[in-house]
A protein has these predicted regions:
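N-terminal type II signal-anchor transmembrane helix
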Residues: 3-29
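C-terminal helical/tail subdomains of lipid-metabolizing enzymes
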Residues: 3-4, 341-344, 360-445
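Active-site catalytic motif of lipid deacylating hydrolases and related acyltransferases
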Residues: 19-106, 183-185
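Patatin-like phospholipase
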Residues: 91-93, 100-192, 196-198, 238-248, ...
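Extracytoplasmic/secreted cell-surface and envelope-processing proteins
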Residues: 100-103, 138-139, 207, 232, ...
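Sec/Tat-exported extracytoplasmic proteins
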Residues: 111-115, 132, 140-145, 162-173, ...
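Active-site gating loop/helix substructures
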Residues: 215-307
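Internal helical hairpin/lid segments
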Residues: 293-294, 299-300, 308-315, 329-379
Length: 445
């Protein structure tokens, strides 16, 4: 009997050891970038005055310096916008959405085609901000929408954007093992393929002229992410990451680090860390986990600079004869704000959840609803910071109803489904071709 127990114990111990070794081998751990000087070009993201009011009693509420790069960029955009013969200097906000970013890729490709020989799909953009998949788009759009680039280079940027959102199979983007195996692998997907794909999008076959063009862009571009340890929102200056890098290849790595940090959704994606000059690796999360901060930050700066510019010409609420006159002066002074929601604004019904109580399906549904509400709430809240300016929006709604035979209009648990992404690219084309165009205005307050 004792011998049997000893044998059972030995077998159990052996199996436990084998499982521990296997666990150690297959568990992904963190994907780490080592980018010298990375955090020199990363700024704190002030949540704006309204959220600061809400957080008044918090022990540490960050407030940005007014001379940070994004403040300066928006200040210049406002000043440029009101110059009599200067081109418009508007703002483009690109949201997150993972594979839904294929919608934005299709949209901007079609807008570029509609512009003819100019290859300039949206004129007058001075500042671009991106979160998650929007940060990946921001890299390409800093060149594709830059009037100082050649049409050939703008077309090259659009082509690389579309290529990035046109995988032939999901494994070209992530190693997707699913939520059920998260305890084993540490995340639902490994992102080493994404790192490789971003570098290839920027430097196809080692040709990094697109990276050089990003550094020389006349458009300021920023990618937002969140530090895991304290939850602070930060953003990277994409031009500076290029211009201060020792080579274009190193610059491409720095851009990949910033955009992957902006896309690293906890649990779903492999943890992402970036080590700067001091060698300390910092864990960074998808900027969407604090979605409102970048939008709020941008709009707070726009509002402040617009009111300052109006006051310099003697226009204040006290000086105008009516609210309507003040609102009109505000509208004329403020840059236009374009918003691309790379995703839908409503979720499909899921009646099967009335019959199933499993944690994975219910947890995924709750997450989807939270993300959806977070995204549309962030867009609606833009009006709090910019009460009278023009805010123009487009979304990936209609993906399952618009007339198309391209790809498929549904997905299951895939993170990057090629056929679905093809349908989303076609949706972008469809909305650009509509009689009234892809954009519609948000109501003013």
């Amino acid at each position: 009997m004792i011998d049997i127990l000893i044998c059972i114990g030995a077998v159990t111990l052996g199996l436990a050891l084998i499982l521990a070794i296997a666990f150690k081998i297959v568990r992904r751990g963190a994907l780490t970038f080592e980018i010298d000087g990375f955090y020199t070009h990363v700024m704190d993201g002030d949540p704006g005055p309204i959220i600061r009011d809400v957080q008044r009693d918090a022990t540490a509420v960050l407030e940005c310096k007014l001379d940070d790069p994004m403040s300066c960029s928006i200040k210049e955009a406002v000043e440029c916008h009101v110059e009599a013969e200067a081109p418009e200097c508007n703002v483009l906000l690109l949201s997150g959405g993972g594979q839904w970013g294929a919608f934005g890729a299709g949209l901007f490709k079609r807008l570029s085609e509609q512009s003819g020989a100019k290859e300039l799909g949206l004129e007058g953009i001075g500042v671009i901000t991106g979160i998650s998949t929007g940060s990946l788009q921001a890299l390409m759009m800093m060149v594709a929408l830059d009037p100082k680039q050649t049409p050939v280079m703008r077309r090259h940027a659009i082509d690389r954007l579309v290529w990035g959102y046109s995988p032939e199979k999901e494994s070209e983007v992530v190693r997707h093992t699913g939520l059920a195996l998260v305890p084993f692998f540490g995340s639902a997907a490994g992102t080493a393929p994404l790192r490789k794909r971003i570098i290839e999008a920027l430097c196809p076959d080692g040709d990094c002229r697109l990276v050089e063009a990003i550094g020389n862009s006349s458009i300021a571009g920023y990618a937002g992410f969140v530090e895991a340890d304290d939850g602070s929102f930060r953003y990277a200056d994409l031009r500076e990451l290029v211009n201060k890098a020792p080579s274009l290849e190193k610059a491409a790595e720095a851009l990949a680090a910033a955009t992957m940090a902006s896309s690293a959704m906890p649990v779903f994606h492999q943890q992402l860390r970036v080590a700067g000059s001091d060698g300390k690796a910092v864990s960074l999360y998808d900027g969407g986990v604090r979605r409102s901060v970048f939008f709020d930050r941008t709009m707070a700066i726009v509002d402040r600079q617009v009111r300052k510019e109006m006051a310099s010409h003697g226009v204040t609420k006290a000086s105008t004869t009516s609210q309507e006159n003040f609102a009109e002066e505000y509208r004329k002074t403020a840059p236009k704000v374009y918003v691309v929601r790379n995703g839908p604004t409503v979720r499909k019904p899921a009646p099967e959840l009335n019959r199933k109580s499993g944690p994975l399906k219910n947890g995924q549904r709750g997450y989807d609803l939270l993300v959806n509400e977070s995204e549309i709430g962030a867009i609606a809240a833009l009006r709090l910071g910019n009460p009278y300016g023009e805010i123009l929006l487009t979304t990936a709604d209609m993906y399952d109803t618009f007339p198309s035979t391209v790809g498929e209009n549904f997905k299951d648990d895939e993170m990057f489904k090629p056929a679905f992404m093809a349908r989303l690219r076609d949706l972008g084309r469809f909305k650009a071709d509509r009689k009234d165009g892809p954009w519609w205005a948000l109501s003013t307050l």
